[in-house]
Amino acid sequence: MSRNIRNVLNMSDLPPQPNFSYELDLQNQGFFHIAGVDEVGRGPLAGPVVTAAVILSKDHSLDGLNDSKKLSVQKRNRLYCEILQSALAISIASICARAIDQSDIRKATLEAMRRCVMGLAVPAHYALIDGRDIPPHLPCPAKALVKGDQRSVSIAAASIVAKVTRDRMMEHAGQVYQGYGLEKHVGYATVAHRAAIAEYGPVIGLHRYSFALIKRYKEDIS
């Protein structure tokens, strides 16, 4: 039997907010260091995909953990600081736009997830992965949880770390590549971003040339 489990769950069984039940169940089985793993940035036209792995202690006092997309910027930033201070271990990995183009976004995301689990200072005994896919060659058993950032506090913590990290990277990119509004839309295909690409063209190393929308703009310029 495979030690990796893909857990496709009914969306109607989502808890009101993420909880520690998956982690406690695994700890009762002898897996004490549970890493929650999540990604941010699969869909944007520009910038990296960023992943984070977070191991929380079971007596953590983080209040209001949830899927990063459901939090205000202020609350997300507060929780980000609290996670950095209280987590047993945190690891972050990113794959740049060029590398995404050389592979594909799914493979790049899984590779970034693998790297951040491998990079944990406290080795994970088990990994809870947000989504349907489990990265290959992990150093520990793993389970994939659909909507995991709404089920597991460890995955929710990872989603916050990945989101804040990527947003800050894109804010910096906005200072370097002015005129694209990256600090506002962080690379997503907003009307303003598409208009800027149409006017200035895509940027090598920033935009994902393997994405259909960028390909179309490139062909129009050519």
Curated annotation (Swiss-Prot):
UniProt catalytic activity: Endonucleolytic cleavage to 5'-phosphomonoester
Residues of the RNase H type-2 domain: 32-222
UniProt main location, coarse: cytoplasm
Pfam family, any one: RNase_HII
An annotated GO BP: mismatch repair
EC identifiers of the protein: 3.1.26.4
Location within or outside the cell: Cytoplasm
A Gene Ontology term for the protein's cellular component: cytoplasm
Coiled-coil positions: none
Xref: SUPFAM superfamilies: Ribonuclease H-like
Cofactor: Mn(2+); Mg(2+)
Alphabetized UniProt keyword annotations: Cytoplasm, Endonuclease, Hydrolase, Manganese, Metal-binding, Nuclease
MF-aspect GO terms: manganese ion binding; RNA binding; RNA-DNA hybrid ribonuclease activity
Residue numbers binding a divalent metal cation: 38-39, 130
Cofactor note: Manganese or magnesium. Binds 1 divalent metal ion per monomer in the absence of substrate. May bind a second metal ion after substrate binding.
Matches recorded under CDD domains: RNase_HII_bacteria_HII_like (cd07182)
Its job: Endonuclease that specifically degrades the RNA of RNA-DNA hybrids.
Family of the protein in this entry: Belongs to the RNase HII family.
NCBIfam families noted in UniProt: PRK00015.1-3
Protein name: Ribonuclease HII
Naturally occurring in which organism (per UniProt): Bartonella bacilliformis (strain ATCC 35685 / KC583 / Herrer 020/F12,63)
